[in-house]
Design a protein with these regions (language model features):
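Signature aromatic-anchored transmembrane alpha helix within multi-pass, membrane-resident enzymes
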Residues: 6-10, 158, 196-203, 280, ...
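Short helix- or helix-capping micro-motifs
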Residues: 10-13, 106-111, 138, 160-164
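Catalytic lumenal/periplasmic loop and adjoining terminal transmembrane helix
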Residues: 18-20, 210, 337-459, 464-477, ...
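Membrane-lumen/periplasm interface segments of specific transmembrane helices
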Residues: 192-245, 258-262, 350
Length: 608
């Protein structure tokens, strides 16, 4: 019966993941990993930091099996390791509990969770790292539950080191798992063997990574820069507007689905923790330490927007405790508790919850991919593509052959070039009349399980009448589903191209949660003629100024400013000095001719 349950669970897990393979590139890191398979260049973020040396090496070896197409290679590798990971995690939990049934059901719970249904088959490093983590748990458990030869201790140490080399972020989970295992080994000789092999294996992949960066100095500079970004963004700014309770929900509850799915899982885990403590289950300590340390670090330091995917290394610990809780209920009810039926219902609920998003991902192009394919079909050869920062990797990988730049960088170089067509590639659904929008439906699973990006993407031709150069005090574009804007700081300076226009029209707004009752801003043309804009909540303020001939500089000077992080009652970490939002700019009645279109390139680059 126990083997039948394990086999049935394996079949269900395989079917769920193999039928949920993504059709095209979707998320930010996917393009970077694909480019790394073609050319491993960690300093240029191919792949993203911190390098993933073992993952990319395995992907390069597997590439011939998938026709040397990086996207297929990485999705195939993720699918294979998802199935292998289930088997390994089942073995690991069986080793720790001594119960094949509990092992199978614990692994089944983890691999049918909404977090895994969505993320396990993406062309990223998570799935393989989780399979290696499962192998590490199994081997560490074997070393603690059996009288093993020292070779098994070496195997456990190697598995832990390879897991870290596959995805370095997993060190936060692997180190406490390995460290607690070492402490529980029977002798100092065994402990020395474990630490020795772990250090040797880590040194091997670390030396390869340093060699790929060129030198120890370059490696240190690269990693220091990434650490500084992590401290500024993930551990600080990204937590804007979120309370501690909201962050905890993001990392601990959301991976298991909505409340009606997550609460039973967490309750079972709490029951399992009680049972483990009551029985003084020594072999459970490494897994409990793994999850506890990882969750503590995540809650204190990691970006909550990506909390569900970032929580993956700690979730096997929750699944293990839930498996203990299930086994406890089965014991006290004398097998009246039908555990496999309960887990089957959970899997059904998890798929019902994530299915609408999974089916879109499987059957249709992701919005960024669809937008880029459309852009390749309409943009002339001399066009410049201005991408939103979240779409930089997509542009690098899928728009080769085009000039691609960030919005302000492109406007600075080509804003005055009326002979150069400009297109904006935006990570949002535009309201521009000439824009083309590509979108998926975004159910609750999208909101809770993803970073909130790439549900829609747009291609927007940028008319010469709406171009300007942000010279001073103008923030980069920010977008939501309802529009886009640029914050103006203590003073904003804008340069306009010479179109022979008679006037320029500017639109200002402020959000509904604006901390000031109202604000006034003086807009002047080259220090000459000026107009005052009165900006209030819920209204658009439009001002128009006459323009002299030639290139023109506009200066916008608000009367009041604020710093979001200093506003009482807000949870903001934004320390910028802000005043009002610029939501529109257009020169009226231009006399310059529109740019002549150059015949577009006939070739397309296929990906996915």
């Amino acid at each position: 019966m126990q083997r039948a349950i394990f086999l049935g669970a394996a079949v269900i897990v395989a079917l769920l993941h193999l039928t949920s393979l993504p059709r095209t590139i979707w998320e930010y890191d996917e393009s970077l990993f694909c480019m790394a398979v073609e050319n491993y260049d960690p300093l240029n973020h191919f792949p993203p930091p911190p390098g993933y040396p073992i993952y990319i090496a395995v992907a390069k070896l597997a590439a011939p099996l998938f026709g040397y197409v990086p996207f297929r290679t990485l999705t195939g590798l993720s699918a294979f390791t998802a199935i292998a990971g289930f088997i390994l995690l089942g073995f690991a939990f069986r080793k720790l509990t001594g119960d094949t049934r509990a092992g199978a059901l614990g692994a089944f719970l983890f691999y049918t969770s909404p977090a895994m249904l969505l993320h396990a088959t993406l062309p990223q490093s998570d799935s393989g790292a989780l399979a290696l983590l499962a192998a590490s748990i199994w081997l560490c458990g074997k070393c603690l539950t059996e009288e093993v030869d020292t070779k098994w201790i070496a195997f456990a140490a190697l598995a832990c080191a390879i897991t870290v080399g596959w995805r370095l972020q997993f060190a936060i989970a692997v180190v406490p798992l390995f460290g607690m295992t070492v402490l529980l080994l029977r002798s100092w000789r065994e402990r020395f063997i474990a630490v020795q092999w772990f250090a040797i294996a880590c040194a091997a992949w670390l030396i390869a990574l340093i060699a790929a960066t060129g030198s120890v100095e370059m490696f240190w500079k690269w990693m220091s820069g990434q650490a500084a970004y992590f401290a500024e963004h993930d551990a600080d700014i990204s937590r804007t507007g979120r309370s501690t309770a909201q962050i905890a929900l993001r990392f601990i509850s959301h991976p298991w689905g909505p409340k009606w799915l997550a609460l039973p899982v967490l309750a079972l885990a709490a029951l399992g923790l009680f049972d483990a403590a009551k029985r003084r289950l020594r072999v459970a300590l490494p897994v409990i330490a793994m999850s506890a340390v990882y969750f503590a670090f995540a809650l204190a330091m990691m970006d909550p927007a990506d909390g569900v995917r970032y929580a993956l290394p700690a979730l096997p610990g929750i699944a293990f405790l839930a498996a203990l809780g299930i086994a406890f209920l089965r014991r006290i009810t004398k097998d009246v508790f039908v555990d496999w039926a309960v887990l089957a219902l959970y899997a059904f609920g998890a798929y019902a919850y994530t299915g609408p998003l999974l089916r879109q991902r499987t059957r249709s192009d992701a919005p960024p991919f669809a937008a880029i394919q459309y852009l390749r079909s309409v943009a002339p050869r001399n066009a410049v593509i201005l991408y939103d920062l979240p779409l930089k990797p997509h542009s690098q990988y899928l728009l080769r052959g085009f000039t691609r730049m960030k919005v302000d960088e492109g406007l600075m170089r080509f804003g005055h070039r009326t002979d150069v067509p400009l297109y904006e590639l935006t990570d949002s659904a535009t309201q521009a009349p000439d824009g083309k929008v590509f979108r998926w439906n975004t159910p609750d699973a999208y909101t809770k399980l993803t970073r909130g990006h790439y549900g829609a993407a747009s291609v927007v031709p940028l008319p010469v009448t709406q171009r300007f150069l942000a010279l001073e005090g103008i923030s980069p574009p920010e977008r939501t589903r309802t529009g886009s804007w640029r914050w103006i700081g203590a003073r904003g300076t804008i340069s306009l191209p010479d179109l022979g226009a008679r006037s320029v029209r500017l639109t200002f707004e402020v959000p509904l949660d604006y901390p000031l009752a109202t604000n006034r801003a003086t807009v002047s043309v080259d220090g000459g003629q000026s107009v005052v804009a009165e900006v209030t909540k819920g209204k658009k303020t439009v001002v128009e100024l006459p323009l002299p001939p030639g290139r023109v500089t506009l200066r916008i000077v608000p009367e009041q400013t604020f710093v979001p992080a200093n506003v009482p009652g807000r949870l903001s970490r934004d320390r910028r000095t802000l005043s009002i939002m610029l939501t529109g700019l257009e020169q009226a009645a231009p006399r310059a001719a529109a740019p002549a279109a150059i015949p577009r390139a006939g070739s397309k680059r296929a990906a996915g």
